[in-house]
């Protein structure tokens, strides 16, 4: 009987499940938002007008009032300065210009890859033309081309034929490419590297 009392006593003392309380943060995601208009929380700022004239050090509320009178925004341009520097401007136009500049910078930042074109020294004419087209396409894209001729067994004895084929590839793509590394034997391969011509 004692075990029954202990068993039922244990269940009677079960606590009701605790409710999970989720605290909402009002500033969630605020860190990623730009510091403009009402989001500026500094006690004092250095304000600059839309035409570049200094308005002096003032409370952000006063600078915001000036910006609103001109239908413009107050934007923090230098948060680290003492006091932080804010400028009166059209924020939509400013953001568009920044995105445009970043896009142009990304376009100019093409990194040259090394593409490989493999063939045998006994390659047929059609297959050679395909490799030549690939080489020209890679060079036009601004990439380097590693032309590789693979040898099997005793074929390495014909290294002179392989070198002639690589030099023919260099001559056929000479309009847009130049030899960066002369043909050389590496293991069971002969390799030549072409790079786009500097304009």
From Swiss-Prot:
It is found in: Cytoplasm. Its main location: cytoplasm. InterPro entries: T_IF-3_C_sf, T_IF-3_N_sf, Translation_initiation_fac3_CS, Translation_initiation_fac_3, Translation_initiation_fac_3_C, Translation_initiation_fac_3_N. Keywords: Cytoplasm, Initiation factor, Protein biosynthesis. It holds the Pfam family IF3_C. One of its GO terms (biological process) is ribosome disassembly. GO terms for cellular component: cytosol. GO terms for molecular function: ribosome binding; translation initiation factor activity. Belongs to the IF-3 family. IF-3 binds to the 30S ribosomal subunit and shifts the equilibrium between 70S ribosomes and their 50S and 30S subunits in favor of the free subunits, thus enhancing the availability of 30S subunits on which protein synthesis initiation begins. PANTHER family: TRANSLATION INITIATION FACTOR IF-3, TRANSLATION INITIATION FACTOR IF-3, MITOCHONDRIAL. Monomer. This is Translation initiation factor IF-3. It comes from Gloeobacter violaceus (strain ATCC 29082 / PCC 7421). The lineage of its organism: Bacteria, Bacillati, Cyanobacteriota, Cyanophyceae, Gloeobacterales.
